[in-house]
Amino acid sequence: MPSLEPWLWGDSCSWLGMLAMLRLRLHKSNMDFTCLFCCSLAFVLYLNTLGAGFVYDDRRAILANADVSGGTPWQRSFSNDFWGTPLTDSGSHGSWRPLCVLSFRLNYLIGGGFAPWGFHLVNNLLHCVATALVVRVARTLLASVWAVLAAGALFAAHPIHTEAVAGVVGRADLAACVCYLLTYLSYLRHMRWRESGDPRQWLALGATLILAAAGLLCKETAITALLVCALFDVMRGLSGQVDKQRLRSVCIVLGALFCMAYCRLVIVPGPQTAFSSADNPIARTPSAWTRLLTFLYLPVFNLRLLLQPNVLSFDWGMDALPRVTSLWDRRNAQSACFYSVLVGVAWGSCRQLLSGSKEVTHCGVSSTFPQYHIQKVASRKSRSKRKRLANNTKYQAFEAAYHQQQQEALPCRDCNNNNSSGYVYEGSSPVAQAPAQAPHLVSSAFRGSRSSSSCSNSTNSSSSSSSSSSSSSSSSSSLSGGFQCSSKDYALEGMSPANRHACVLIMSLSFLALPFLPASNLLFYVGFVVAERLLYLPSVGFCLLVGYGVSKLMSCNQRTRNILLLSFSLLLAAMSLRTLRRNADWRDEESLYRSAIAINPPKALGNLGSVLSSQGRYEEAKQVLQEAIRFRPNMADVHFNLGILHQNQQVYPAAVECFQRAIKFRPNLAVAYLNLGISFIALGKRQQAIEILQAGSNLDGAAVRDRTAHDQARSSAYLQLGALYVEQGKLQRALAIYREALSSLPGLPQQREILYQRIGDVLGRLQQWDEAERHHRAALELQPNQVAAHLSYGITLARNSSRASEAEMWFKRALKLAPEQASVYHHYAEFLSLQSRHHESAIYHRRAAELAPNDYTLVVAAATAMRLLDRKVDAEMWYRKAVALRPGDAHAHTNLGAILHLLGRTNHAAASYKAALRLQPGDAITLGNLAKLGVTNV
């Protein structure tokens, strides 16, 4: 009877192989689901940002940036800063992020303009990509699936990321993080291909450098990615994973880092002016001791934001973070503990790696003998050198050990290959094993051979039983946290447990500290104290540390694992809820500023007052702005906003006081000069207005941050000044003012177009028709689709009776460009009225009033046009609307009384006349109309 034992043995082996393959697929499936879960969590948590608008810095960086709206060539993004100001300008912020600006421009082109949801959607997707890359990075350092899941989920849900994702300008941090992580992963691929001798290693190295440069073009902090890559390569060498090409790769990476840093710091211009004291008051503190203690505390405070993100703010400037002025401040103890732990962990990890390197050097732990030493003889061109090397006793011993290993490895070719570095782990301590014939294997971390795998053919009963017991224990632990990442992703394969522990800690701290270092104020001062969006990239290291802690705790007993899973689930839920609530704060500016009142009262209240004032909520805005001034009396912006509020309420004396205070606290605030001049004009103080407008138009703008807004305010001051001279009949003086504005403001095409129009109007009044037409043509060349240029040209031509038909053509072109603009209909109606075409004029006057029913001037013009056509009932309707718009205007009541008089409704007419006299006693026209009604006693 034939024996069934071989068949049963073969069948059992096949089943074991199938189970092994199934388990491997489950592991891969779990890792895919990990990435899918984390990305889905990231996307869902930020879905409520799609309905948000542009807030805070978004307005200047996006809405007011010509590099985004297409007002400048796309190449200009590389010579302008993040806000659209030339880097060579004295007021440039110095932040150079051209790729981020170009992404905004692409958003603008594809989304059909400034549609906020498109910008927010891209930010959300970038956060999902960054989350997926964090999972990939975690797989390279953390062996446990639970650790990877914890790191990825925490990164997806952490509330500290809200500013970077919900604020559109945070895209710079999102894109920099994506490039940063891709740089690291690309360099890992380069290392893997380099160690296997794959020529694609150069492709991966080139991709590493390109991605690092792209990260630099997104945000400057991403340049530290090359440091992380070089550091990991060095640690691999210190851990026994030796490769003779390591030094070459590290030198290339560090050389590229130096070149990029040189280009950014030297070739690309930096900021020309210092930041304001309100942005970083600590840097302006006279006491060096206070500056040192406070800046040493800032990393501790940022770590607190990562650990406890319940108190967040859009701005941490001014005095939001109290300064550390005394050595006995308890925050110094926190700083001391923080730096002690940081230095202790870093030093302990480095000592472990260095001691492991010495052990490798002196004990010869690696069983992966470097083959290039064996081939060294054949590569020698000189026969004498080959002979001298072959006779070397150390080389002979090395070659004998190598051939012995090759012979021992032949019978076990089909054994399991774990890419071991020669350690047999007993418990947690590594035991080095190597053939006694190899006295010296590795000279240093940068010299040696490519690591390869080895196997043992020892098959005694004790090893068999130990392997079976270890397999059973590993299968039981896999249910609780022993799921291990595949060797394809895991980059610490072949290291001892102690070296793995050291590498994970150092790499996590590197991801945490290196990107944060340029913005820490420790190396050089920056224009802020704390910025939450700057923690987006460093939080990768924080999440890796948390994930590593989870993996350690998951190796404990079942009760501890259950408690850990429950606790982490609750933590993740709390983080997610906090993120959703924080997203609601970033939905609009009012909610954002209200959320920070308790943290930074002067800045939050000042910005909130401006928002409320723009919404017409004047009384509430007034209280908020006055409260902000009580917190910080020297805020020029708040005084200016309060002046604008008074100006909108036509309380001009109070507005004048506010604008004067704003100029006192910031003498180069051009827009304050402009509005102060407008307030003086409203008060009838023409001479004072001229003096203020002249001073405002002559401001040079040195050290202002928003040069575009400053120049626009200067241009408006020139226009107001010229209009004053035109009103006074000083046409030559007005002409000189407009021409001076043209010569001093060459970089504003829209403002130049208006100036050309004004010059053309003045020249038309002076009957210099050829010059007037030339300037109007110049305005049309600058802005061919500008409605105002068409209207201005038409008005000028209309003054010349011989060119009336040509003037009408330009009015009709303006109507085609702006069929819903009331002023176009009004000017065309005025032209028709001058041509005595009153029926057509009345139609266009009425259309203008219908398009702008709250415009008093247009409503009165429509009423007058109806009266001229003897359509008294229609005229009465429009005059009543005028009275409703301006019940305090005596002329409105007089006009209504006159039309009622013509309609024969004498009692109502008398009532309107009396109302006019109450507002303007003694008006001769109104008294005469009353006398016609027979009313003499008023």
From Swiss-Prot:
GO terms for molecular function: dolichyl-phosphate-mannose-protein mannosyltransferase activity; mannosyltransferase activity. One of its GO terms (biological process) is protein O-linked mannosylation. It catalyses: a di-trans,poly-cis-dolichyl beta-D-mannosyl phosphate + L-seryl-[protein] = 3-O-(alpha-D-mannosyl)-L-seryl-[protein] + a di-trans,poly-cis-dolichyl phosphate + H(+); a di-trans,poly-cis-dolichyl beta-D-mannosyl phosphate + L-threonyl-[protein] = 3-O-(alpha-D-mannosyl)-L-threonyl-[protein] + a di-trans,poly-cis-dolichyl phosphate + H(+). Glycans are attached at N800. TPR repeats lie at residues 602-635, 636-669, 670-703, 715-748, 753-786, 788-821, 822-855, 856-889, 890-923. Residues 23-34, 130-139, 186-208, 271-291, 532-533, 581-938 are extracellular. Residues 450-480 are annotated as: Disordered. Pathway: Protein modification; protein glycosylation. Residues 1, 56-108, 161-164, 230-249, 313-510, 555-562 are cytoplasmic. SUPFAM superfamilies: TPR-like. It holds the Pfam family TPR_6. One of its GO terms (cellular component) is endoplasmic reticulum membrane. It is a multi-pass membrane protein. The chain crosses the membrane at residues 2-22, 35-55, 109-129, 140-160, 165-185, 209-229, 250-270, 292-312, 511-531, 534-554, 563-580. SMART domains: TPR (SM00028). It is found in: Membrane; Endoplasmic reticulum. It comes from the Eukaryota. Its EC number is 2.4.1.109. Belongs to the TMTC family. PANTHER family: PROTEIN O-MANNOSYL-TRANSFERASE TMTC2. Transfers mannosyl residues to the hydroxyl group of serine or threonine residues. This is Protein O-mannosyl-transferase Tmtc2. The gene is Tmtc2.
